[in-house]
Amino acid sequence: MTINPVSRKVAWLRVVTLAIAAFIFNTTEFVPVGLLSDIAESFHMQTAQVGIMLTIYAWVVAVMSLPFMLLTSQMERRKLLICLFVLFIASHVLSFLAWNFTVLVISRIGIAFAHAIFWSITASLAIRLAPAGKRAQALSLIATGTALAMVLGLPIGRVVGQYFGWRTTFFAIGMGALITLLCLIKLLPKLPSEHSGSLKSLPLLFRRPALMSLYVLTVVVVTAHYTAYSYIEPFVQNVAGLSANFATVLLLILGGAGIIGSLVFGKLGNRHASSLVSIAIALLVVCLLLLLPAADSEAHLAILSIFWGIAIMVIGLGMQVKVLALAPDATDVAMALFSGIFNIGIGAGALVGNQVSLHWSMSAIGYIGDIPACAALVWAVLIFRKWPVTLEEQPH
């Protein structure tokens, strides 16, 4: 399919709007991390009980990414985006109105359905809409929108929730999505589906050991991170005994450090992606190990969060870039699988953190998260040695 020639300005506006959409979708996934205590208080529940919402959301995305991608594979992309945004916005209105925890979970499942479709098509859409010769920059913009969700979206959502209530945070995200939808309707041309892949491309991807090994690494390292990260807000208040305001500051520091991580990866990622990811996983191991000892002071936790934020950003960007490089002939299927696998890790980590907090002690989330982190480090070293050229340069 050939899109009618458009000015570079319009082409970039389309990509930027998609990047804003990526920011909004990732913000709504992560923002409950900063609102757990407030949601728990409003429904008279324990924080760890509310935390199961994180696992449900992530696993719905994980399970539904590939089926939804296949079900919508022939659907015109502009129409598909409009439909999933309508579902996304309506579900946020329901989150705002939620009269009990069950209704809130149902609303989050609706958002997760929209999320599952969005992330399976976004990378390939960005490539199609990009100005000539600017595909890499377009993907970088989408990655930046994703990264900013943790850098700005989560902390801002936490601040809004702290001062105006958690319901207002969800309502604001819904309104942001509505504005973005109106921009997409105005800017996007009709986009017939192409290169979306099908079940036929799955065996092809499964026969790529470098890609499969990367998927395994993704789920293990994401599980490690989210075991601790999912409960960092109640950890700061209940274990470290620090204020709710400092919990907000810490989330800002952790997210802001992601900017440093993205700059580092942008500078060195093309040449040294494998080494950077391995070093970042090693840094994650150290951060999780030191989480409880660092809880003795605000300064120690702040310093640790800087390195933690850098590490997880480098890991996330590295994985995404490698998956796209290893599956250029089936980007939608590969990214749907990646999104699903990433969310299996989020859900698993949140569930482990939930169980540790409920049945043992929230103070142990760093130590427990360190177990899969160490396994991820060993696996990373092994696979990057076995497929150094494949992972760095080749699509097969």
Swiss-Prot record:
Keywords: Cell inner membrane, Cell membrane, Membrane, Sugar transport, Transmembrane, Transmembrane helix, Transport
Entry GO terms, CC: plasma membrane
Pfam family, one: MFS_1
Gene Ontology molecular-function annotations: carbohydrate transmembrane transporter activity
InterPro entries reported for this sequence: MFS (IPR011701), MFS_dom (IPR020846), MFS_Efflux_Transporters (IPR050189), MFS_trans_sf (IPR036259), Sugar_effux_transptr_put (IPR023495)
Topology relative to the membrane: Multi-pass membrane protein
UniProt family annotation: Belongs to the major facilitator superfamily. SotB (TC 2.A.1.2) family.
Function: Involved in the efflux of sugars. The physiological role may be the reduction of the intracellular concentration of toxic sugars or sugar metabolites.
Name of the protein described by the UniProt record: Probable sugar efflux transporter
Gene source species: Salmonella paratyphi C (strain RKS4594)
